[in-house]
Amino acid sequence: MDIRQMNRTHLDHWRGLRKQLWPGHPDDAHLADGEEILQADHLASFIAMADGVAIGFADASIRHDYVNGCDSSPVVFLEGIFVLPSFRQRGVAKQLIAAVQRWGTNKGCREMASDTSPENTISQKVHQALGFEETERVIFYRKRC
């Protein structure tokens, strides 16, 4: 298995994996996200490849605003991670996280953060298994003006 930072040749593989994680996200929106990741210095995606097949990805960003539970800035933020079901429990996600962490460290980050919804217990377990610690639970509100 090989972990690579996404480049243009990986876009179709990445989009296929991403559609499995976020199936409600329109295809053209995935493409626009991919183009933005390729062009922006504060965004990156890493692809796990095995025998020429994309088996997982991790999207990340560098955030300079307040990140819940963090004490420093900037923070490398895990925006999303996905591994094909047949490749789970084999250390793929761990290697993807290590690549994201190295990228963030090279960008001056001392902390990595992520989030998930309170009802997504599978994601919570994955985060804990990958070394993340829960920092807080937040409910957001809005009021239209």
Swiss-Prot record:
Cited InterPro entries: Acyl_CoA_acyltransferase (IPR016181), Aminoglycoside_N6-AcTrfrase (IPR024170), Bact_Acetyltransf (IPR050832), GNAT_dom (IPR000182)
Query: Where is acetyl-CoA annotated to bind?
Result: 81-83, 89-94, 120
Which GO terms fall under molecular function for this chain's record? aminoglycoside 6'-N-acetyltransferase activity
GO BP term, example: response to antibiotic
Complex formation: Homodimer.
Q: Which NCBIfam families match?
A: AAC_6p_group_E (NF043067), AAC_6p_Salmo (NF000140)
What this protein is reported to do is described as: Catalyzes the transfer of an acetyl group from acetyl-CoA to the 6'-amino group of aminoglycoside molecules conferring resistance to antibiotics containing the purpurosamine ring.
The protein's name in its UniProt record:
Aminoglycoside N(6')-acetyltransferase type 1
Task: Please spell out the taxonomic lineage of the organism that makes this protein.
Answer: Bacteria, Pseudomonadati, Pseudomonadota, Gammaproteobacteria, Enterobacterales
